[in-house]
């Protein structure tokens, strides 16, 4: 069983942390992953830097740009991660846009993920139908879970279709805006979380966009299995460095 599925079966709320590989410094990637696991994080999303990240807010965009300037590439990321499973047990997901994966070669990328011990991918600009028709078989051959995003605007019919194609969790976008732009959830968002919960989907949902502290984590996990923190974590790295990871995580739980 995939590590993601094993983790989702645990009787606890899931905290997933996102960061941009190669930020703040090019060689921080492994240290950040190891420190996050030691701090009690359940799952990690490793951002594959891209020059045009459409869904990302300014904090993640800036970290992605800096990572590229630092010299991060897809090839280098896999090189950095080649021994990661000797020290890290929790699920690892690569989140990135489809262009760099296409350039690398989808088959080669998935093969490298499997060799490295990556458990899943989140590719915001890969449509579910294109995935199902052209890439699902390749992903599954290499043991990879593919995670799709849904928003408050996604129809119930579309959500059920995504649920039928998915085999891990569904990334529940808390609003239709970019990442890092919210500070708490209003009644409309809370009702949206509740509505999705009441659909009784086969895949659990994890909420992203707008979670930045203990309060918003608890709000997000009232109806869903877990929550993802990205912008707030990167902001903390920028201001306080890698040594602050344990303190940051301890203030969420």
UniProtKB/Swiss-Prot annotation:
EC number: 4.2.1.20
Pathway linked to the protein: Amino-acid biosynthesis; L-tryptophan biosynthesis; L-tryptophan from chorismate: step 5/5
Catalytic class of the enzyme: lyase
Record's keyword annotation contains Ribonucleoprotein: no
Keywords: Amino-acid biosynthesis, Aromatic amino acid biosynthesis, Lyase, Tryptophan biosynthesis
PROSITE patterns: TRP_SYNTHASE_ALPHA
Catalytic activity: (1S,2R)-1-C-(indol-3-yl)glycerol 3-phosphate + L-serine = D-glyceraldehyde 3-phosphate + L-tryptophan + H2O
Record-linked Pfam families: Trp_syntA
Gene Ontology MF term list: tryptophan synthase activity
Disulfide bonds: none
Gene Ontology terms: cellular component: cytosol
Active-site residues, record numbering mapped to chain: 45, 56
Family: Belongs to the TrpA family.
Physiological role: The alpha subunit is responsible for the aldol cleavage of indoleglycerol phosphate to indole and glyceraldehyde 3-phosphate.
Quaternary organization: Tetramer of two alpha and two beta chains.
Name used for this protein in its record: Tryptophan synthase alpha chain
Organism, scientific name: Flavobacterium psychrophilum (strain ATCC 49511 / DSM 21280 / CIP 103535 / JIP02/86)
């Amino acid at each position: 069983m995939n590590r993601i599925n094993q983790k989702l079966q645990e009787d606890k709320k899931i905290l997933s942390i996102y960061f941009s590989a190669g930020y703040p410094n090019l060689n921080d990637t492994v240290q950040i992953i190891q420190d996050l696991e030691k701090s009690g994080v359940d799952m990690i999303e490793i951002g594959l830097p891209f020059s045009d990240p459409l869904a990302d807010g300014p904090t993640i965009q800036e970290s992605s740009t800096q990572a590229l300037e630092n010299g991060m590439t897809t090839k280098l990321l896999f090189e950095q991660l080649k021994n990661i499973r000797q020290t890290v047990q929790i699920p690892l997901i690569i989140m990135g846009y489809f262009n760099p994966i296409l350039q690398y070669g989808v088959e080669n990328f998935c093969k490298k993920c499997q060799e490295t011990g990556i458990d899943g991918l989140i590719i915001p600009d890969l449509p579910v139908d294109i995935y199902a028709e052209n890439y699902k078989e390749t992903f599954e051959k290499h043991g990879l879970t593919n995670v799709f995003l849904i928003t408050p605007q996604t129809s119930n019919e579309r959500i059920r279709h995504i649920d039928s194609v998915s085999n891990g969790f569904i990334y529940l976008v808390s609003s239709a805006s970019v990442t890092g732009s919210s500070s708490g959830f209003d009644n409309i968002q809370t009702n949206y979380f509740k509505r999705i919960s009441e659909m009784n989907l086969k895949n659990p949902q994890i909420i992203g966009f707008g979670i930045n502290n203990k309060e918003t984590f608890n709000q997000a996990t009232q109806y869903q299995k877990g929550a993802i923190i990205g912008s707030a974590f990167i902001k903390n790295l920028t201001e306080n460095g890698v040594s602050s990871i344990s303190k940051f995580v301890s203030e969420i739980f």
